[in-house]
Amino acid sequence: MKLLSEKATCNSHGQDSSYFLGWQEYEKNPYDEIQNPKGIIQMGLAENQLSFDLLESWLAQNPDAAGFKRNGESIFRELALFQDYHGLPAFKNAMTKFMSEIRGNRVSFDSNNLVLTAGATSANETLMFCLANQGDAFLLPTPYYPGFDRDLKWRTGAEIVPIHCSSSNGFRITESALEEAYLDAKKRNLKVKGVLVTNPSNPLGTTLNRNELELLLTFIDEKGIHLISDEIYSGTVFNSPGFVSVMEVLIEKNYMKTRVWERVHIVYSLSKDLGLPGFRIGAIYSNDEMVVSAATKMSSFGLVSSQTQYLLSCMLSDKKFTKKYISENQKRLKKRHAMLVKGLKSAGINCLESNAGLFCWVDMRHLLSSNNFDAEMDLWKKIVYDVGLNISPGSSCHCTEPGWFRVCFANMSEDTLDLAMRRIKDFVESTAPNATNHQNQQQSNANSKKKSFSKWVFRLSFNDRQRER
């Protein structure tokens, strides 16, 4: 007789993904400038550590908030007791106003429609429980965040059907890709309950444009399904074009009095924009009262501590601080992004043009020994074990094209990033002859075929020639 549940013993958590395996290898041999200078540098973790000094400065200037005081009087006992799981009103108001500020105050949010969760991971899973039954499917554009295989599927039993996007158009979402994914789900006898997108994208570091957002809204309207817009990177946009929230497009296109209004749900957190993943601050925003009610009840399994809510309600209510923080943080992200792009370019490596996020989508297709995912994994292993950099292979993000990698840049010092760039440049230079020989061999084979072809091509009809190509 089995003593453990099927959920406890199943292998569907996704922990065997190369995304998580890279973390494990880093933890075995972490880089340290003094203690372990040849260790693995963590470039597979999307953390924003660039503006901690701004947060620390605010805390030093506001000892009451950090010391759980109000007007000099301790409120420790008040915060230590059970709180309403709807969340502290002061924090929810501060959170919705901060969300508006991140979006340039072009849209406003009602705190009554906000559900607090212990991070965006909890928010996304809670929405799955609210919107899908076991075996139902959500469509996700590829490449997507590897953790979604765990967050959306493991405990809920929901399925993910990929919307295959291509580098030919910068991995943009197209109508044909949406329809193909929908039909694929139907062929697999899966009931499609919605589409989930990250905007800005993880791992691409790009923002969805208005055309894509309008396309998504039209699609979910026609199919009668939901849209989840994960906007946890909305405050990390450091270059044009600017960030456009799906809420803006809903209002611009007058969806307020349609069924679509209640079928669009936003996920947000302070992990990326404010660099506080350890504080576990996430949120669901929905115009559907039933979703808000159900998600609020479920949030009792992953509450945000009252102490954290009080501290951050004070911080986010300081508009002078939030304005300075948003601006300065974006400047620092822009500088660090440019440093990574320049370093990779000096090594002969290009990136997808991006304007947001804490990472770049890096093109290493020319370094593959062959054009397949086995070669991608071989290259990834060399970069992790030989070069000493933990980066995320595109296959872990369900990219359909081998040779792409996500590389993070905001979770380390400039000196560490500079060292990482020197390591990758040395690696490319040491392997360049092999890569060149591989390319030359391919070209030689192609030329040989062309010469052979020319000897008897006159015998073929035009149609035969077309088929040969």
Swiss-Prot record:
InterPro entries reported in the protein's UniProt record: Aminotransferase_I/II_large (IPR004839), Ethylene_sulfur-biosynth (IPR050478), NHTrfase_class1_PyrdxlP-BS (IPR004838), PyrdxlP-dep_Trfase (IPR015424), PyrdxlP-dep_Trfase_major (IPR015421), PyrdxlP-dep_Trfase_small (IPR015422)
Pfam families, per database record: Aminotran_1_2
Biased composition (Low complexity): 437-447
Catalytic activity annotation: S-adenosyl-L-methionine = 1-aminocyclopropane-1-carboxylate + S-methyl-5'-thioadenosine + H(+)
Cofactors, names only: pyridoxal 5'-phosphate
BP GO annotations: amino acid metabolic process; ethylene biosynthetic process; fruit ripening
GO MF: 1-aminocyclopropane-1-carboxylate synthase activity; pyridoxal phosphate binding; transaminase activity
Entry EC number(s): 4.4.1.14
Induction statement: By flooding.
Pathway assigned to this chain's UniProt record: Alkene biosynthesis; ethylene biosynthesis via S-adenosyl-L-methionine; ethylene from S-adenosyl-L-methionine: step 1/2
Alphabetical UniProt keywords: Ethylene biosynthesis, Fruit ripening, Lyase, Pyridoxal phosphate, S-adenosyl-L-methionine
SUPFAM superfamilies noted in UniProt: PLP-dependent transferases (SSF53383)
Region spans: Disordered: 432-452
Modification sites for N6-(pyridoxal phosphate)lysine: 272
Family of the protein in this entry: Belongs to the class-I pyridoxal-phosphate-dependent aminotransferase family.
Function: Catalyzes the formation of 1-aminocyclopropane-1-carboxylate, a direct precursor of ethylene in higher plants.
Subunit structure: Homodimer.
Protein name per its UniProtKB record: 1-aminocyclopropane-1-carboxylate synthase 3
Organism: Solanum lycopersicum
